[in-house]
């Protein structure tokens, strides 16, 4: 089927929680929403259950996360597209709640919580949280995963920024400001595991520019392009999603795409050159405008802002 409201785009490579993520989406959508998942060079295990609102594309050779997201978007006919990671859970009716307050020049995300996906459990009786690793500290044997799949209590994130590198940062101080209060608040940047905008804006702004590489700086790219083109990046506090944060492969859930300092640094250098040097051709505002709007910001000084203005 082809949804009219939202196409949820999921680029995935060897993601063990993809099927669970899709099941969670299907169980919680209330608008005319579909899932378009791209299996980027790897079949998923466990397999994805068939559902009329789920479309799966298999690529025998990996093309990268940004390219896979773009491929999924080309298959959409919905008004909105929402990119999400393949290891997330969602609030009931999250899609309808996001649409209700949406504006066509916004990029929006709901409150982000931490996903408690599983615990490690050993036959000797020891159990611990997902980030502690699969080796039992009591008997030394390999532990098994026990699914939990619930948002962690007390984990709610509403505001994000980036420093002069640029490197992603949480912006908790902003939530204490008057402009950081309310059901709908602005955010300088995004974490990148989920965001929604119109499909027209996705293509107009080249939201997933493949020249950035497969991975890295996506939240910065999406947020800065939205702000500098005249739009707004908003957080909707009326709903939430929960994201499972990866640690290391030896802990049982590493990164599915090859991770190298060169790749991540390359994306940062691309972002810095494109936005800090005001080279993005769709910008109607300089980056200094965005920084000044949210100052004070962790990782920025008044001197940094002045230097940015003088570039």
Please state what every model-predicted region is.
Residues 89, 93-163:
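Conserved donor NDP-sugar-binding/catalytic core segment of glycosyltransferases
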Residues 60-75:
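Glycine-rich, basic loop-to-helix element that forms the pyrophosphate-binding segment
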Residues 81:
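Short aromatic/hydrophobic "clamp" motif used to bind/position activated sugar donors
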Residues 30-31, 37-48:
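A conserved acidic beta->alpha catalytic loop
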Residues 98, 188, 194-195, 200-206, ...:
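A short, conserved alpha-helix in the catalytic core of glycosyltransferases
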Residues 1-24:
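N-proximal low-complexity "stem/linker" segments adjacent to membrane-targeting elements
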Residues 23-33:
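Short, acidic, metal-binding catalytic loop of nucleotide-sugar glycosyltransferases
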Residues 126, 130-136, 140-151, 164-182, ...:
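Terminal low-complexity segments of carbohydrate-biosynthetic enzymes
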């Amino acid at each position: 089927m082809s949804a009219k409201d939202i196409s949820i785009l999921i680029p995935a490579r060897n993601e063990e929680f993809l099927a669970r993520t899709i099941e969670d989406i299907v169980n919680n959508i209330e608008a005319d929403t579909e899932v378009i998942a791209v299996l980027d060079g790897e079949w998923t295990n466990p397999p994805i259950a068939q559902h009329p609102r789920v479309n799966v594309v298999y690529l025998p050779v990996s093309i990268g996360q940004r390219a896979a997201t773009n491929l999924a978007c080309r298959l959409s006919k919905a008004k909105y597209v929402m990119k999400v990671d393949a290891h997330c859970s969602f609030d009931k009716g999250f899609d309808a709640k996001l649409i209700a307050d949406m504006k066509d020049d916004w990029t929006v995300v709901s409150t982000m919580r931490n996903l408690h996906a599983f615990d490690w459990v050993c036959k000797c009786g020891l159990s611990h949280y997902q980030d502690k690793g699969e080796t039992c500290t009591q008997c030394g044997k390999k532990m098994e995963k026990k699914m939990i799949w619930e948002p962690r209590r007390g984990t709610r994130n509403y505001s994000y920024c980036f420093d002069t590198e640029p490197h992603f940062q949480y912006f908790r101080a902003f939530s204490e400001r008057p402009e950081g209060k309310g059901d709908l608040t602005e955010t300088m940047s995004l974490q990148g595991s989920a965001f929604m905008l119109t499909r027209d804006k996705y293509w107009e702004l080249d939201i997933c520019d493949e020249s950035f590489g497969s991975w890295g700086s996506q939240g910065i790219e999406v947020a800065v392009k939205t702000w500098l083109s005249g739009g707004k990046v908003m957080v909707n506090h009326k709903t939430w999603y929960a994201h499972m944060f990866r640690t290391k492969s030896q802990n049982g859930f590493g990164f599915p795409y090859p991770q190298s300092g060169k790749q991540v640094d390359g994306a940062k250098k691309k972002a810095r050159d494109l936005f800090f040097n005001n080279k993005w051709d769709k910008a109607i505002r300089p980056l200094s405008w965005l920084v000044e709007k949210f100052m004070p910001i962790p990782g920025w000084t008044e001197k940094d802002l002045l230097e940015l203005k003088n570039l």
